[in-house]
Amino acid sequence: LSRLILLDIYENMFHNEFPNAMEIMHLTKNQISEMIEMGHSIGTHTHSHISIGSSYLEENELNFEIIQPKTYLETIFKIKSEFMSYPFGQTVDCLSSKELIIKTDSYKLAFTVEEILNKKSTSPYELGRYMPTSLDTSELLYKKMVSMINGK
């Protein structure tokens, strides 16, 4: 249901006001190809940017959200796509390691949006990440890393 609501908002409000939103917000096939040629690994981020863990998706909806983007990347670009980043990162928004493996068995790593220090004991399906912004400097990033290491 949340996916349908989000898609309705997108199609009936956002897309009407910004008809070229897809070109602005998403990478083109050429941009993705260039990134692959430069050596980047390409992962997925779900199809419609919903909270996977709290949406109570049917199996076909879960496949559409998690598996379809992976299949698309692998088919179009002839690559292995084994990583995903949850659109939202609170615990309620993510599948547990066990759930992700049982429901898809398709990924090796999954990233939340929690700013945590990843350790050897961190599940590969619940990795933290830091989302830098255009305002970040190397000094600010260093301070953030020190803060994360110190558990603050």
Q: What do the PLM-derived regions correspond to, one by one?
A:
Residues 13-16, 43, 65:
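Generic alpha-helix detector with strongest preference for long hydrophobic helices that associate
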Residues 30-40, 72-79:
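A structural motif corresponding to the C-terminal end of an alpha-helix
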Residues 15, 51-52:
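A broad detector of the eukaryotic-type serine/threonine protein kinase catalytic domain
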Residues 41-51:
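Histidine-centered catalytic micro-motifs
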Residues 37-42, 122-125:
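Sequence-level motif detector for i,i+2 pairs with an aromatic at +2
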Residues 1-38:
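Extended, charge-rich helix/loop segments that form flexible
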Residues 47, 54-152:
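C-terminal active-site subregion of NodB/CE4 polysaccharide deacetylases
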